[in-house]
Amino acid sequence: GASGLIPVMRN
């Protein structure tokens, strides 16, 4: 979700 910016939100 965070386009890879946040490790747990790599969606």
Curated annotation (Swiss-Prot):
Keywords linked to the UniProt accession: Amidation, Neuropeptide, Secreted
Post-translational modification Asparagine amide, affected residues: N11
Any single biological process term in GO: neuropeptide signaling pathway
One GO cellular component, as annotated: extracellular region
Signal peptide range in chain numbering: none
Compartmental location: Secreted
Secreted as UniProt keyword: yes
Family classification: Belongs to the periviscerokinin family.
Record function comment: Myoactive peptide; has excitatory actions on the hyperneural muscle.
Name this polypeptide is given: Periviscerokinin-1
